[in-house]
Amino acid sequence: MIMAMAVLSAVLFSCVREEMTCDKELIVVQRIGEGGYVYTRGAAISSNTDLKEETFGLYGSLTPNASVPQPYFNASATVNADLTATISPLQYWPGLLNASMKFFSWYPYSDANAPTASFTDPGEMVLNYTANESAANHVDVLAAISGPIWVEGVNIHFYHTLTKVTFTFKKVAPVPNEVTIEKIEFQNVGKSGNLAMTEIPTTTTKNGKPKFVWSDVATGRVASTPTGNKTVTEDATLIGDTFLMLPTDAFSATAKIVVTTNFGDREFLFSDILAKNPHSWESGEYINYNL
């Protein structure tokens, strides 16, 4: 009995010192949300219901009292039918007082074209993303940062970080009787980059969405090869895949769109397009080019 009492005293002492507590509360994701108006949302995720049964990355950053952020866990979570999420493996609130936690989330998590997340600084998430050369394989990159009240449920609100781009074609005289679109290609546009996030940006786009800024951007080619309807008619018709591109406020002098038809290639320099219709690619926004 004396030995048992001594062990119990040691346990109690270890829990109380350094502002620690002994209770283990499960970290619960109580709500998954998604931001943006329906007409500007991404192609893959149009609402939070599209995230049901999907898996996203979830990183916990812990800041003890009067200290600096430190890693706590790096896991994943799967969205349930009721728009809660189950963390795998299960995570528990640390037994600390006067501490805080921040949760970083990113989607997609396990897709072959998913971004990679790094946390060299535990208080910052850096997403590295490379757009697939084929628009058919593009993914809708979402990001979220949550700072819940200690030991309360976590609400995760995802935002779109890329720009949705599509093409509409319409036959205008004197084009030949039958025109088909064989390929649509962006050349010398942003293809890969890094998105560093400590908070959701307070700077917004023209439609009030967070303006995510990608850095270390490398340019390249991204194309769509239509497989369904690709015939241009007198009625304006969307043709080709939806592109999900890195946002940019400044296109290079050599950036262009190359459209391949059954009659050959036609090039459209962005400098010429912008001269007639000034615009930029903003995160969470939808750009459609009429050709």
Each predicted region: which residue ranges?
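Sec-type signal peptide cleavage vicinity
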Residues: 1-2, 10-291
